[in-house]
Amino acid sequence: MPAFDVICRGEKFAHVELQVPGVHNVKNALAAAASAIALHFPAAAVEEGLAAFHGAGRRFEHKGSFHGAEVYDDYAHHPGELQALFSAVKGMGYERIICAFQPHTYTRTKALFSDFVQVLREPDLAILAEIYAARETDTLGISSRDLAEQIPGSRYCATLEEVTALLREIARPGDLILTVGAGDIY
C-alpha cells in the first residue's frame, strides 16, 4: 500500500501510510493533509487519521474469498474509474486479475463504447455481465455482448447467475476477482 512523506514549506510534516491502493487515493490523502495543515492540525492527527481510513463502501471493498481467490467490489462505472482501479491493483502481486463488469445504462455504454473496449482489455480476463438498465429501456440496440466481441479473450454472461457460475469454474488461488459496476453485480 502507498506510503509517503507530506512536505510543507520545504520540511517533512508527516509520514503517511495508506490502507487503500492507487494514485487516486494518494491524491485524496494529500488533499486531506493540505486541509488539515491549513486548519493547524498536528502531524500526528494527519498520520493517524489517514492510516485509519480503510476506504469507502463499494470502492475497492474487500468482500472475502471465493475458491481461493480474493474478491473485491468497486462502484466504477466509467472508463476513467476503471482505469484508476486497474492501475491500483496491477502491482499488488496477484497471478491473474479477473474483472466481472456490469455496464451501467445503455446510453453511457453506447457513448463511451470505444473507451470501455480499450480499458477492459487491461485485466487478464474481462467478464461482461449484461447492461444494468437503471432508468432506461434499450432503444439503442446495444448489449454487453457487443463489448465482449471487441475485447479479445473476454466472456459475455447474459445473467448474474452465469457470471457466478463462470467464476466458480475458473477462480483459483492467487486470483484477484473484481466485481465492478454501479448496478447490482455486487
Task: Annotate each PLM feature.
Residues 5, 24-25:
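C-terminal accessory "lid"/substrate-recognition subdomains
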Residues 1-14:
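Acidic-glycine-rich active-site phosphate/pyrophosphate-binding loop
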Residues 11, 21-24, 31-186:
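ATP-dependent carboxylate-amine ligase
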Residues 17-18:
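Histidine-centered acyl-transfer/condensation active-site motif
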